[in-house]
């Protein structure tokens, strides 16, 4: 695999530590072009920006982190080269879509956009000042931004919405919000997912019960036609599948791909329960 940021034709020697242009002259002057120097300077500034982001995760929004994540991947990996995550992997889908949207964007452009975004996040950032390295100074593959996005990010309390509280299984907050009519129990996010979808995806059985008691639409479908039953089945939460069925969930509803809930699970026990229930309704 070509070494990033080296001019065309440059390779690493057998020792891995010396550059070779393909001849035995050992003359490196050809590499000292203005273009090569500019690329090297940009790469160094990019690495400093990536290190600085480690301290900005708490103040950056989800959208800003995704923006940075996509450009980091474009620089380090290149064009998006992995399959789209499964429908129930919300976080993975968002990251994949952000990266995929960059298309054939060059590493140079991605680095410039990344650096500009960091400067916008922290106008007072001085690249000449070395970053302090703590226990998190080395974050492994992907760098600071990628690492933070591969885990549930910490969201400031004032920035949380009802779906964040649902993800956290904060039953008390959600119950109060619904009863005070601050939120509609059937409100959906940008993907058409209702609170019930989220609760089923995360395996929060008690929250599912609360939402059903608050008259959540049990057969509500998201933008891909999937119901809460699809989510519970796909995530193999058999107890939630049974709870939904007992509460009137329809196992005959298909998603946009034509799949029944029993067809999106890898668990034979869950699939069998759904098949038997569907047969009983026939």
From Swiss-Prot:
Name of this protein: Acyl-CoA-binding domain-containing protein 6
Alphabetical list of Gene3D superfamilies matching this protein: 1.20.80.10, Ankyrin repeat-containing domain
Residues the record lists as binding an acyl-CoA: 69-73, 95, 114
Bilayer-crossing regions: none
Entry's Gene Ontology molecular function annotations: fatty-acyl-CoA binding; lipid binding
Modified residues (Phosphoserine): 41, 106
Subunit composition and interactions: Monomer.
Pfam families: ACBP (PF00887), Ank_2 (PF12796)
Annotated source species: Rattus norvegicus (Rat)
ANK repeat residue numbers: 191-220, 224-253
GO cellular component: cytoplasm; nucleus
Main location: cytoplasm
Residue ranges constituting the ACB domain according to the UniProt record: 42-127
Localization (cell): Cytoplasm; Nucleus
Region (Disordered): 1-34
Keywords: ANK repeat, Cytoplasm, Lipid-binding, Nucleus, Phosphoprotein, Repeat
Function: Binds long-chain acyl-coenzyme A molecules with a strong preference for unsaturated C18:1-CoA, lower affinity for unsaturated C20:4-CoA, and very weak affinity for saturated C16:0-CoA. Does not bind fatty acids. Plays a role in protein N-myristoylation.
Coiled coil: none
């Amino acid at each position: 695999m070509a070494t990033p940021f080296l001019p065309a034709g440059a390779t690493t020697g057998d020792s891995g530590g010396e550059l070779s242009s393909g001849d035995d002259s050992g003359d490196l002057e050809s590499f000292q072009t203005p273009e090569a120097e500019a690329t090297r300077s940009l790469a160094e500034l990019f690495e400093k920006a990536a290190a600085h982001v480690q301290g900005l995760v708490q103040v950056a929004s989800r959208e800003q982190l995704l923006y940075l994540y996509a450009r980091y991947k474009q620089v380090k990996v290149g064009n998006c080269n992995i399959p789209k995550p499964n429908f129930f992997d919300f976080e993975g889908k968002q990251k994949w879509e952000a990266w995929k949207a960059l298309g054939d964007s060059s590493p140079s452009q991605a680095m410039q956009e990344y650096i500009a975004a960091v400067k916008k996040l922290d106008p007072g950032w001085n690249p000449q000042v070395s970053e302090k390295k703590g226990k998190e100074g080395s974050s492994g593959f992907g760098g600071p931004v990628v690492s933070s996005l591969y885990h549930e990010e910490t969201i400031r309390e004032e920035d949380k919405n009802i779906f964040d509280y649902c993800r956290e299984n904060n039953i008390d907050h959600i119950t109060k919000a619904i009863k005070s009519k601050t939120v509609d129990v059937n409100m959906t996010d940008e993907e058409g997912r209702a609170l019930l979808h989220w609760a089923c995806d995360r395996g929060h059985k008690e929250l599912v019960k609360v939402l059903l008691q608050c008259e959540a639409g049990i057969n509500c479908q998201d933008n891909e036609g999937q119901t809460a039953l699809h989510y519970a089945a796909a995530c193999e939460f058999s107890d939630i599948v049974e709870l939904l069925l007992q509460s009137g969930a329809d196992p005959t509803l298909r998603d946009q791909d034509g799949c029944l809930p029993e067809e999106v699970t890898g668990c034979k026990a869950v699939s069998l329960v759904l098949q038997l229930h569907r047969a009983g309704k026939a």
